[in-house]
A protein has these predicted regions:
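Short, surface-exposed "cap/lid" segments of acyl-processing enzymes
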Residues: 164-195
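C-terminal catalytic histidine-bearing segment of alpha/beta-hydrolase fold enzymes
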Residues: 333-337, 344-380
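The feature captures the conserved acid-bearing segment of alpha/beta-hydrolase catalytic domains
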Residues: 269-270, 275-289, 301-338
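Short, polar/acidic, helix-capping and beta-turn segments at strand->helix junctions
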Residues: 1-101
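Catalytic nucleophile-loop/oxyanion-hole region of alpha/beta-hydrolase
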Residues: 183-192, 203-242
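A fold-wide structural signal in alpha/beta-hydrolase
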Residues: 171, 196-206
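Primarily recognizes the serine-hydrolase "nucleophile elbow" in alpha/beta-hydrolase
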Residues: 227-291, 304
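N-terminal cap/lid segment of alpha/beta-hydrolase-fold proteins
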Residues: 111-166
């Protein structure tokens, strides 16, 4: 057992102060050859505990942006007067011996972890996330919208944006990523720009984040949200026509699971999802069972199989467009290729987007050739 820290940050805003301090701790973990899953405890020493309360959703999201769902027990202690407003230290376990040999497609564990770590492939990711937050807030600030509850949970919410001057528009639904453990609908509203400007209504979905719910629970929430939107369409001012659905990263997985759903068995139209764009998603989950995140998702080999879209029947009622960034890892490209093969997606609707990584491909979806392709795919 070792102790890392204390780490501090100086910023006027407590959320950004926490985010920067946690990122310093993340770098210290990396330097020590450890990861977030090795942390056994944290101590936050602060002069203002109320400012860093993880019960505050904004603080919770800032934590998750750095460490996702990995959260050891956290002790809060008062700092002496005159010290930094926040300092953080962590106790870290000795790494367990690594399994020997290949685990998936010839990859050993360290290589597999790198392949499935988009953050590790994009060193300067913090400015990208800041761009997400700022652009999302600006987009929502510039467009009338309302938050609607589709379920009882605190994150079972959606933001609904309606185009001006169009009665009962068709609906475009977007599901954000974050490895099922992080991010928020408000960080992603800007990526629906092309659809809103084309006259679609837009629903931005939030959902519970692991480990507060396992992955199958998140799939159920997305299905519930889509059913809610169909049943409430007249009251919400949207058309009862097949939806267009999009999802990025973990949201791509959740969107694919929705596409593969037997909607008729749930008392809904079989073509509830008419068209879908799946961006840099995860469609074969077996390799994730070897990674430290698996327990957070309650994912084992059995659940990974039936939660993998590649093992579900090919949807006949939905026209699917697949895209992945040209700068993404071989495994993320392979994930998209697997679904294209399993679902017999035509070559013209399976795209590798040049010069885009896992986090910037959504910019291309907001405006650019990928946006035009998604709109063409969604056209009746």
């Amino acid at each position: 057992m070792i102790e890392l820290g204390p780490v501090t940050a100086m910023h006027d805003h407590p959320v950004e102060e926490l985010r920067q301090a946690l990122d310093h701790l993340r770098l210290a973990l990396m330097s020590a050859g450890r990861g977030p899953h090795h942390m056994t405890g944290m101590v936050w020493t602060t002069t203002a505990p109320a400012l860093f309360d993880l019960a505050n959703p904004t603080i919770d999201l800032a934590y998750r942006e750095v460490f996702a769902g990995f959260r050891p027990p956290i002790e809060i202690e008062m700092a002496p007067a005159g010290g930094p407003r926040l300092s953080i230290r962590a106790t870290v376990a000795r790494p367990a011996p690594l399994p020997v040999g290949p685990l998936w497609r010839g990859y050993d564990l360290p290589t597999l972890m790198r392949e499935y770590s988009p953050r590790g492939q994009v060193p300067a990711v913090a400015p990208i996330f800041e761009h997400y937050r700022e652009e999302g807030a600006a987009f929502l600030g510039a467009h009338a919208h309302r938050e609607v509850a589709y379920g009882a949970g605190p994150r079972e919410r959606l933001d609904l944006l309606l185009p001006s001057g169009i009665a009962e528009p068709r609906l475009h639904v977007f599901i954000h990523g974050g490895y099922w453990q992080a991010m928020d609908k408000g960080n992603h509203a800007q990526f629906t720009r092309a659809f809103l400007e084309a006259g679609y209504a837009v629903a931005m979905l939030n959902y519970s984040l692991a480990p507060e719910k396992p992955l199958d629970g998140l799939v159920a929430e997305i299905r519930a949200a889509l059913g809610f939107l169909w049943h409430q369409a007249p009251a919400l001012g949207i058309a009862r026509l097949p939806f267009d659905l999009a999802g990025h990263s973990a949201g791509g997985h959740l969107a694919a699971m929705a596409v593969a759903t037997d909607w008729a068995a749930l008392g809904l139209p079989p073509d509830l999802i008419g068209t879908a764009t799946l961006l840099s998603g995860l469609y074969e989950l077996e390799p994730l069972t070897h990674l430290p995140m698996a327990p957070l998702l309650a994912l084992d080999r059995i659940s990974a199989h039936w939660l993998s879209p590649v093992h579900l029947p090919r949807p006949s009622a939905t026209r699917v467009l697949l895209a992945v960034g040209g700068l993404e890892s071989d495994e993320f490209k392979h994930q998209t290729a697997l679904l294209a093969e399993a679902w017999n997606v035509p070559v013209g609707r399976h795209r590798i987007v040049p010069d885009r990584n896992h986090f910037t491909i959504v910019d291309e979806f907001a405006e650019g050739p990928l946006a035009l392709a998604a709109l063409a795919n969604a056209a009746p």
